[in-house]
């Protein structure tokens, strides 16, 4: 399974092509829409979320509600494009724009300057438009389909927020607090911490500042042995790490107890192996459900650190690339905090990697055969 996205933040829309989804998967379009809506929510989002009402237009690969096995083509319209038609048109301009929206003052922390250097763009909007987190809407659409495929195999993927702006939630088992997490404006299981997080976001907004945080993605009911120890690109944790770090503003990733593992003795962090009538399992899950690049059957736990969004309403020092004079960076519309929304995006990219690894292992072209193969494998490892 693989996918590719195209499109700009203020262009006509986002396109995505997904290859490798088996035939016979009945798509719940309402669930796809719920995933798109979840991405647009979360405390701290900016004004654009009031403009865009993301809807997925299927243009191929799904017929009469089920996948055909052909590449799936999706399109998500940018409602805001109506205000940017001339600025973003593909055809050469016939006259000078009244408001060209040229970007020559790169924003620290964004792709603006380095992208301009790499591709030779004197108008850094050509970098901004594609590097924008708007692209993650397409990834959530892909993830929505991947999650439905995994659901057919009994595998679930969800997320919760562990911290925002230095405010940490008390540790709880997120699997026991799903309803609380989904109802929380900041996707936090600790309701007292959630209130403090929202107050911090409000203050950051008043200050023209932004906040980052930490998200955990959890994958439950995984069968063991997905991934491989044989090559670096087939290791499951390697694939997941690459995918989550590719999401805008993500700067660190850990598994299980993450960076805390580096501070402890080996005797306290290895997960002891036990066995009963259900098969092998671990006494603890410090390593986050992956050993040697393969799933162990325990819940996969992925922690991801998101930096504060670099677009500030009180912008930082920059340089105009035309005059070389010092200026404050250009201001673009942005969020004060996108950590809760990022959690939904991270769910999607993790789901895609899990689905891709499962499909690579079982290599079937229809959903029925895939389900049969997974069921047989689960029984095989139970009896091992």
From Swiss-Prot:
Note describing how the cofactor binds: Reduced FMN (FMNH(2)).
Catalytic activity: 5-O-(1-carboxyvinyl)-3-phosphoshikimate = chorismate + phosphate
A biological process from GO: aromatic amino acid family biosynthetic process
Keywords tagged on the record: Amino-acid biosynthesis, Aromatic amino acid biosynthesis, FAD, Flavoprotein, FMN, Lyase, NADP
Superkingdom to which the source organism belongs: Bacteria
Keyword field contains Amino-acid biosynthesis: yes
Binding site for FMN: 130-132, 248-249, 292, 307-311, 333
UniProt keyword Nucleotide-binding present: no
EC number: 4.2.3.5
Residues annotated as binding NADP(+): 39, 45
GO molecular function: chorismate synthase activity; FMN binding
Involved pathway(s): Metabolic intermediate biosynthesis; chorismate biosynthesis; chorismate from D-erythrose 4-phosphate and phosphoenolpyruvate: step 7/7
Cofactor(s) for this UniProt protein: FMNH2
Pfam families tied to this protein: Chorismate_synt
Entry GO terms, CC: cytosol
Bridged cysteine pairs (disulfide): none
NCBIfam families the record matches: aroC, PRK05382.1
Quaternary structure annotation from Swiss-Prot or TrEMBL: Homotetramer.
Role, per record: This reaction introduces a second double bond into the aromatic ring system.
Record family assignment: Belongs to the chorismate synthase family.
Protein name: Chorismate synthase
The organism of origin for this protein: Exiguobacterium sibiricum (strain DSM 17290 / CCUG 55495 / CIP 109462 / JCM 13490 / 255-15)
């Amino acid at each position: 399974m693989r996918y590719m996205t195209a499109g700009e933040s203020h262009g006509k829309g986002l396109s995505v092509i997904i290859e490798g989804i088996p035939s016979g998967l009945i798509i719940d379009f309402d669930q796809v829409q719920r995933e798109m809506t979840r991405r647009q929510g979360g405390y701290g989002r900016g004004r654009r979320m009031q403009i865009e009402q993301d809807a997925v237009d299927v243009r191929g690969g799904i017929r009469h509600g089920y996948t055909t096995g052909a590449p799936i083509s999706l399109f998500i319209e940018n409602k805001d494009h109506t205000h940017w038609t001339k600025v973003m048109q593909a055809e050469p301009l016939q006259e000078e724009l009244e408001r060209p929206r040229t970007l020559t003052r790169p924003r620290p922390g964004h792709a603006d300057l380095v992208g301009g250097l790499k591709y030779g763009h004197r108008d850094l909007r050509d970098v901004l438009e594609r590097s924008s987190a708007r692209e993650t809407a397409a990834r959530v659409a892909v993830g929505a389909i991947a999650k439905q495929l995994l659901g057919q195999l009994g595998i679930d993927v969800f997320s919760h927020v562990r911290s925002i702006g230095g405010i940490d939630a008390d540790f709880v088992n997120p699997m026991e607090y799903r309803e609380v997490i989904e109802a929380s404006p900041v996707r936090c299981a600790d309701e007292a911490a959630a209130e403090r997080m929202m107050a911090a976001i409000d203050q950051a907004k008043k200050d023209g500042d932004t906040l980052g945080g930490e998200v955990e993605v959890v994958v439950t009911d995984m069968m063991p042995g997905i991934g491989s120890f044989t090559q670096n690109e087939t290791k499951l944790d390697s694939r997941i790490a690459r995918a989550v770090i590719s999401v805008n503003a993500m700067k660190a990733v850990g598994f299980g107890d993450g960076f805390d593992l580096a501070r402890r003795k080996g005797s306290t962090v290895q997960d002891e192996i036990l066995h009963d009538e259900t098969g092998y399992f671990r006494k603890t899950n410090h390593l986050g459900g992956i050993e040697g690049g393969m799933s162990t059957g325990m819940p996969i736990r992925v922690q991801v650190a998101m930096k504060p969004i670099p677009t500030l309403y009180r912008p930082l020092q920059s340089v105009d690339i035309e005059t070389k004079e010092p200026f404050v960076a250009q201001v673009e519309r942005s969020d004060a905090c996108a950590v809760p929304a990022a959690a939904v995006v991270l769910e999607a990219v993790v789901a895609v990697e899990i689905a891709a690894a499962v499909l690579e292992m079982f290599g079937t072209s229809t959903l029925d055969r895939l389900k049969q193969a997974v069921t047989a494998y689960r029984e095989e490892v139970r009896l091992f």
